[in-house]
From Swiss-Prot:
Zinc finger extent (C3H1-type): 26-55
A single MF term (Gene Ontology): ATP binding
Gene name of this polypeptide: pan3
Protein name from the UniProt record: PAN2-PAN3 deadenylation complex subunit PAN3
Organism: Neosartorya fischeri (strain ATCC 1020 / DSM 3700 / CBS 544.65 / FGSC A1164 / JCM 1740 / NRRL 181 / WB 181) (Aspergillus fischerianus)
Region listing for Pseudokinase domain, in residue ranges: 263-524
UniProt KW Repressor keyword: no
Length: 661
C-alpha cells in the first residue's frame, strides 16, 4: 500500500510544483539587471535574452510613449457608426446589434483633446498638423479646482517673502475656503501645527479628508513647561531634584501642618463638646496660669466645627463673668476686619462646659504656628544664656514692622484699636510671616473703659514701638529701662530704623498728629522691599504648584486600564472579547505591573511603572515587545497605538448601548 501510494504522492507534487519558467516575450526590450547593478553582464555572450544596450532601451521607451500619448493620433470613431442605419445590406443580427447605440451617441462629435485647438493654426477642428507635436506636460493638464475656495486667503498663505506663486504649482487640497480659486494664483505650502490634535483640520483639509473614526485626543496636560523666573543658573543638561518635585522642606512643612491639624488627644479630661465644637486639643506649651495680658488666665485649644467641618482655634478666658450683654456684641465689628496680617475672629460666646464661667473666642487655626516670644525671646534666653544676645537681622525687623503696620491700617480704618500688640500674642505662621492675634478680647473684657478710640489707636503706636525695641534687644524685660534699651537699639541698627521706632514711642505726645498713615508714609521705601519679597515668594509658589499640576493623570490611566481589562460580564460578547486591541492592553498591563526577574521573583520597580505610564500618557512613538502569558503570542506596538487603543476601548465602554447590557 505504501508503494502504491507513493507514485500518487509524486504525481501530486509534480502537479502542484512550480511551472517551467518561460522566456519573456519582451525580454529583448528589457534592460538586463546586471547592466543596471554591475555595469556589465558576463552572460551576454552565453545566451542572456535581455537587452544589454541602455541607449536602445531609452529610445524605444520614448518612441513607445510618443505612440501612446501623441495628441495628433486619429480620433476615436465607433466601428458601428458607418453602418448605423445606412447600409441596406445589413443582416437582422447586425441591425439588432446596432440598435443598442442611441442616436445621440451616434451623432456625437469625435473626441479631440482640448490642447490640439490651442496648438493648431487650422480653422477647422478636423484638420491636423503635419509637424510632430511635443509630449504632454504637467502644466497643460487641466487642474482640479474645488468649489468653495476663498481667494482672499492667498495673501496669508503666500506671505513668505518669496513673491507670488505661479499657477503651475500643484493644487494643495489641505486648504479650504469659501470662494473659487482665481486663475492668477495657487496655494503655497502650509506649515502644519505641531500642537494640533487633528492635523487635517488644523490645515483646513477636514472638508476634503474626513478623519477616520477614533478617539478624541484629550487636553495636552502632559506637556509641561517650566514656569519662571529661574533663580538657579544651571546648564541645559543639569537637573536638580527640585525640578521634579516640591522642595523637600516645603513638602515636609505641609505634611507636618496636615498631621498637626488632624491630631487628636485620646483619654483627655477636656469637654467632649463646647457649643458646636468637638475634638478639643490643647495648644499651650506652658501649663502655668498667666493673667498678665487680659487680666484672666487664658488657654488655647484646637477644635473642629460641627457646622462646616473646619478646624478653629478656641481661646478661653477662665473665670470671666459677662455683666453686660452689649460687650460680647462688640465682636461683630471685628468680623468685618479681613486682613492678611490679622487672625480672623469668627465668633465669641460664654460656656460652662469647663465647670466654670468661661468666655470663648473663635479664630482661625494656623497649625504649627509660634509666637514671636517663642521664636526670638524665649529661645534666645535658653540658648544664649550667659552670652551676648544675637540680634535679629534688620531686614527681618523691617518685615515685621511693615506687616504690623498693614494690620494696624486695616484695624484703625474700621474704627477699632488692636489694644494687644505683644510678642506673646503675635503668631509666626510661616517664614517671617506674622499675624496679630487676640485683638478683639480687650474690647469685651474692658468694655466699660472710658478711653476714646483715638487714644487707644495712639496707644497702639506706642505698643508697636515697644515691641520692636524688645525684639531688637532680644530680651522681654528690656523696656523696664527705656533709656538703656534705646541706646542698645541705636548701636545695633540703622538710623532709619531707630528714628522710626522713636517716632512710634512718642505716639502719645500731642505736639503733632500721629497716626498709622503717617507712619506708613515714612517707611514707604521698606514697604517696597517687603512687597518685592512677597512677589518673589508668589513666583516661587506658582512654580512649585505648576510641578504638581495634573498630578493625578497616572491614576486616571491606571483607572482606565482596570476599567477595560478582564470584564467578566463581557466575556462571551464577541464585540467586547479580549482580542485585538483589548488583548494587547491586557498584555501591556502585565508588562507594566507583573514583570519578573531571571529567578522568577516579582520586580517591584516604581520607576519602571511611572516611566511606562508617562510614555503611555504622552503617546510616544517608542515601540515595545509584548508577550502573552503562555508565550505563544508576541506583539510589537508603540505607546501611541496603545494610547489610541485604550481611549477607543474606554469610549466604547462609555457608550449608552454598552451600558444597557
Amino acid at each position: 500500500m505504501a508503494s502504491a501510494g507513493k507514485p500518487a504522492l509524486d504525481d501530486s507534487r509534480r502537479g502542484t510544483g512550480s511551472p517551467k519558467i518561460k522566456a519573456r516575450e519582451n525580454a529583448k526590450d528589457t534592460l538586463c539587471r546586471n547592466i543596471t547593478i554591475y555595469g556589465r553582464c558576463r552572460y551576454e555572450d552565453k545566451g542572456c535574452a535581455f537587452n544589454h544596450d541602455p541607449h536602445k532601451v531609452n529610445s524605444s521607451y520614448q518612441s513607445d510613449s510618443k505612440k501612446r500619448f501623441n495628441v495628433d493620433s486619429p480620433s476615436f470613431t465607433p466601428s458601428l457608426l458607418s453602418s448605423n442605419g445606412s447600409s441596406p445590406t445589413s443582416t437582422p443580427a447586425t441591425t439588432k446589434k446596432m440598435t443598442t447605440i442611441s442616436p445621440k451617441a451616434a451623432n456625437a462629435a469625435p473626441f479631440q483633446p482640448r490642447s490640439v485647438v490651442s496648438r493648431s493654426n487650422a480653422s477647422t477642428p478636423g484638420l491636423r498638423q503635419d509637424t510632430v507635436t511635443p509630449d504632454w506636460t504637467v502644466a497643460e493638464v487641466q487642474e482640479f479646482v474645488p468649489q468653495g475656495f476663498d481667494n482672499s486667503h492667498l495673501a496669508t498663505l503666500q506671505g513668505n517673502g518669496n513673491g507670488p506663486i505661479t499657477s503651475t504649482s500643484p493644487f494643495d487640497p489641505f486648504v479650504t475656503t469659501s470662494t473659487p480659486l482665481s486663475a492668477g494664483g495657487a496655494v503655497g505650502p502650509v506649515q502644519p501645527n505641531p500642537y494640533s490634535h487633528d492635523t487635517a483640520a488644523a490645515l483646513g483639509g477636514a472638508a476634503f479628508f474626513p478623519g477616520a473614526a477614533g478617539f478624541q485626543q484629550p487636553v495636552q496636560y502632559h506637556l509641561y513647561a517650566p514656569i519662571g523666573p529661574h533663580s538657579q543658573n544651571t546648564l541645559g543638561y543639569q537637573r536638580n531634584v527640585h525640578d521634579l518635585f516640591l522642595p523637600n522642606d516645603f513638602r515636609e512643612e505641609l505634611q507636618k501642618k496636615a498631621a498637626a491639624t488632624l491630631q487628636t488627644l485620646p483619654n483627655t479630661q477636656l469637654p467632649a463638646q463646647i457649643d458646636y465644637f468637638h475634638s478639643l486639643v490643647p495648644l499651650d506649651l506652658n501649663h502655668q496660669k498667666n493673667a498678665t495680658i487680659f487680666g484672666f488666665p487664658s488657654w488655647v485649644y484646637k477644635a473642629q466645627s460641627s457646622k462646616d467641618g473646619n478646624f478653629y482655634a478656641l481661646r478661653r478666658l477662665e473665670g470671666f463673668r459677662l455683666t453686660n450683654e452689649k460687650a460680647i456684641r462688640s465682636v461683630q465689628a471685628w468680623k468685618r476686619v479681613c486682613n492678611g496680617s490679622v487672625v480672623t475672629v469668627h465668633d465669641a460666646f460664654t460656656s460652662r462646659s469647663f465647670q466654670d464661667s468661661s468666655l470663648i473666642f473663635v479664630t482661625d487655626y494656623h497649625p504649627l504656628s509660634k509666637t514671636l516670644a517663642e521664636q526670638h525671646l524665649g529661645a534666645g534666653q535658653q540658648r544664649f544664656q550667659g552670652r551676648q544676645n544675637v540680634h535679629i537681622p534688620e531686614q527681618i525687623l523691617w518685615g515685621y514692622m511693615t506687616q504690623i503696620a498693614n494690620a494696624l491700617k486695616a484695624i484703625h480704618s474700621n474704627g477699632l484699636a488692636a489694644r494687644v500688640i505683644d510678642a506673646s500674642k503675635i503668631l509666626l505662621t510661616g517664614k517671617n510671616r506674622i499675624r496679630l492675634n487676640a485683638c478683639a478680647i480687650m474690647d469685651v473684657v474692658q468694655f466699660d473703659s472710658q478711653r476714646t478710640v483715638t487714644d487707644l489707636q495712639r496707644q497702639d503706636l506706642v505698643n508697636f514701638g515697644q515691641l520692636i525695641v524688645t525684639l531688637g534687644a532680644n530680651s522681654p524685660t528690656v523696656m523696664h529701662n527705656p533709656t538703656k534699651a534705646m541706646e542698645h537699639f541705636t548701636r545695633a541698627y540703622s538710623p532709619q530704623l531707630k528714628n522710626s521706632v522713636f517716632w512710634l514711642l512718642n505716639g502719645m505726645q500731642k505736639d503733632q498728629d500721629r497716626n498709622i498713615d503717617i507712619f506708613i508714609t515714612g517707611i514707604s521705601s521698606q514697604l517696597m522691599s517687603t512687597f518685592d519679597s512677597a512677589l518673589h515668594l508668589d513666583d516661587q509658589l506658582t512654580s512649585d504648584l505648576s510641578r504638581e499640576l495634573e498630578n493625578g493623570r497616572l491614576v486616571r490611566l491606571m483607572t482606565k486600564l482596570n476599567f477595560v481589562n478582564e470584564r467578566p460580564e463581557y466575556e462571551h460578547d464577541r464585540q467586547w472579547s479580549e482580542n485585538g486591541e483589548r488583548y494587547f492592553l491586557k498584555i501591556f498591563r502585565d508588562y507594566v505591573f507583573h514583570q519578573v526577574d531571571v529567578q522568577g521573583d516579582p520586580v517591584v520597580d516604581l520607576g519602571h511603572v511611572i516611566s511606562c505610564l508617562n510614555k503611555l500618557d504622552a503617546g510616544t512613538e517608542e515601540k515595545i515587545t509584548l508577550i502573552s502569558r503562555d508565550e505563544q503570542s508576541c506583539f510589537i506596538v508603540s505607546y501611541k497605538e496603545l494610547k489610541k487603543a485604550l481611549e477607543s476601548s474606554f469610549q466604547a465602554l462609555m457608550k449608552p448601548a454598552r451600558r444597557m447590557h
